[in-house]
Amino acid sequence: KHIGEYPYPQATAVHSALSAGAGMEYPMITVIGNERFAKSLDQVITHEVGHNWFYGILASNEREHPYLDEGLNSYYEDRYMEEYYPNSSNDNLGMMSKFTGGFEENELIYQYMGRSYLDQFPDQHSENFSLINYDVYTKSSRLFEDAEEYLGVDNFDRIMKKYYEAWKFKHPYPEDLEKVYSENTEKNMDWLFHYFLTTNKKMDYRISKIKHQNDSVL
């Protein structure tokens, strides 16, 4: 629907213990561990099956550039969850969800890492990430959500479908994804590919103009 057709004959989710490799993905099969709730089970299956696209079809190097599979896959996982479980992104936090200040779960994790000076930029080798550092999931997902809002969802989906068609069953690198963007939008995407994916620079918003309209300020 948003990326491209599933080309394999089947998709199978197998239950297994964490010690036996639960939470791992392979083309056409994913291994799922124990989950307490139906929603969280659906979320895990969605994420792991999503890896059939990232990196089972779009076969990026998940060690050198993990955001191309974990980051993009997490973005689409978030879109799925928002579509089928709207306004419930913080359910996994239990009672703590009352104190999140409106942040979604992934945003909250990233904000915590950033405020603690523990955040890392997504486009680096997986060996460089600290233990259980989920920036490559949460920060990357948030950045591609920003790209979706910047381009508009229809344009974003159109570009990602172009990426899929150009690189399915091949080995894309970040420069290949950037090239697809540059060829399919006139908007400047340097902020994504050369700042927020590759450095720890923070967004610096400013007001460019103020416009009065009736009794409102735009």
Identify the residue ranges that each predicted region occupies.
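Hydrophobic alpha-helical and helix-loop surface patches within well-folded domains
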Residues: 1-218
